[in-house]
Amino acid sequence: MLKDITLGQYFPGSTIIHRLDPRTKLIGLVCYIVALFLAKSYVSYALMALVLITLSALAHIRPKTLLSGLKPLIFIVIFTGIINLFYGTGEPLVQFWIFKITANGIRNAVFMVLRIMLLVCGTFLLTYTTSPLQLTDGLEKLFSPLKAIRFPVPELAMMMSIALRFIPTLIEETDKIMSAQKARGASFDTGKLKERAKALVPLLVPLFVSAFRRADELATAMECRCYHAGEGRTRMKELHFAARDAVALVFCALVIAAVSVLRHYGL
């Protein structure tokens, strides 16, 4: 299951989605999330799913690849859906003890599950098509107005980028430690839930040691390359908006407008 966690991975490519300015993709993700929270009908969620499928096709990312990243989140998705299932109003369809299932509760549960799945897949699509360096530059440019109040924008952007990039690294390290302990007789897949949780405790110490070691090595490497954030730092490739970015932003605005219209008319 650890290998199914794909957040933070980057798949190089030359598609139109890969070539978009990272600021455009970040703004697009925000617009997509806003549209998801505006969606209140099956038609709206179908539209948002169609948008995601279209973008993944343009990026040459198979829907199967996007959905594979949801496997580690299945428990959270199901739990959230069940919680929303019992908090609907209206005439109960099924009732037992203090719990009741209504048509509105089923609708809310389906919408919540769809919202989480589409939101996570949209975030995956951003990381799949944007390198950590591009994300750092994009975040720094977007947050640059905060420099007026002496906010450490470059440091924040670098910190977020490194954190995102370290996710697959830590997952790989965890998988190696688990394999080494399994070779010594440890079991992580058998027994009751409490026993499985206890079996994971011995993983924490070597994982933290590995994480701190990697962080120290990264800091040393950055210092050796004379890295410094803030004013005076240059880039090999400066960010520039192109015509395709304008088209993408217009498309984002149209998606929000379409979902807003569907919400207004109850479709």
Residue spans of the language-model regions?
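Alpha-helical transmembrane segments and their helix-start/interface "positive-inside/aromatic belt" motifs
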Residues: 25, 64-74, 245-248
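Transmembrane alpha-helix interface motif
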Residues: 1-44, 48-57, 144, 148-151, ...
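Juxtamembrane/interface alpha-helical elements of multi-pass membrane proteins
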Residues: 73-186
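Transmembrane helix-loop junctions in multipass membrane proteins, especially transporters and channels
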Residues: 41, 45, 60-64, 88-96, ...
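Alpha-helical transmembrane segments and their membrane-interface exit regions
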Residues: 51-61, 75-79
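Membrane-helix interfacial "entry" motifs
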Residues: 14, 37, 60-65, 96, ...
